[in-house]
Amino acid sequence: MFKSRKWAGPATVVMLLSTISAATSAEAASGNPTKIISLSPSATEILYAIGAGSQVIAVDDNSDFPKTAPFTNLSSFTPNVEAIAAYRPDLVILQSSATNAATIKQDLLKLKINVFLEVTPNNISEAYAEFLALGKATGHPSRAKALVTTMKAQISEIVTKYRKKNPTPIFHELDNTLYSADSSTFIGQIYSDFNFANIADAANGGGYPQLSAESVIKANPKIIFLDDGPYGESVATVAARPGWSAISAVKNRHVIVLPLDIPDRWGPRIVDFYRFIGQTTAKIN
């Protein structure tokens, strides 16, 4: 389950438009497409935030925000070239993590359809890079730059207000088999910004280690964040786990269910997630 929700991907955001090479994409990836298909929930949110919403003709089956986006049954995970081509787009935003993404990209290029290949960012700077690249690719560079500037200021204000004076141990739960996200990941960086001490950092797992119940109990986190709340996990289910009642976060009811989807996307609502984390942990020392 968690694999469809977690932040994952190579260390560098690489944006490719049409046949442009990675070395020159930043300079050449510009244009003013009028028929955009977004096969990425994060990209969909970014497009609307930078003023490109009117150019979007279709979005994938997971792009549920904003509600005004033209929702379809196009799959972001298993894209179908024929289904995409039927919309006659002039730009398709494709996730590099999609099944057979490289082949899909080449097949679309053969049909003279430009492709923006999106690689999941590992930190907020890489997310901002996607904002700017999408702005350039869609003809809205100024709006994208302004949005990034505003977001940076808002996040800085939130972190300044809520950052912990002393490191506070936390556990981010991706699913009930105890996969987590360490500080090398996108969401892990957000926790680091608040001076949280991520207990997953002690494990090995390429950014997303699987912890044992014993290691979580021993680490005794003061806060537990549940990314699997929509899948049935709650304060009650966590408290019912053998031995977990001894954990500080459980004893003090500092188990926080994260909002659906926002933690797993790197669009403009990143600011909302920072604010949520700051406000819900403000009184926890």
Residue ranges with predicted function:
Residues F2-A11:
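Bacterial N-terminal signal peptides that target proteins for export
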Residues L17-S25:
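C-terminal segment of classical bacterial N-terminal signal peptides
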Residues A29, T34-I50, S142-F194:
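Basic- and aromatic-lined ligand-binding clefts that recognize polyanionic substrates
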Residues T34-K35, N122, E126-K136, K145, ...:
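Structured C-terminal subdomain patch of bacterial secreted/periplasmic proteins
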Residues K35-Y87, L91-S97, A102, F196-I199:
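A short, structured surface patch at a secondary-structure boundary
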Residues D60, S184-Y208, V257:
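His/Asp/Glu-enriched short active-site or ligand-binding loop at hydrolase and phosphoryl-transfer sites
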Residues N80-S97, I113, S212-L226:
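Proline-aspartate-enriched helix->loop->beta-strand connector
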Residues T103, V119-L134, P169-G188, G232-S234:
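Extracytoplasmic ligand-binding site segments that recognize negatively charged/polar headgroups
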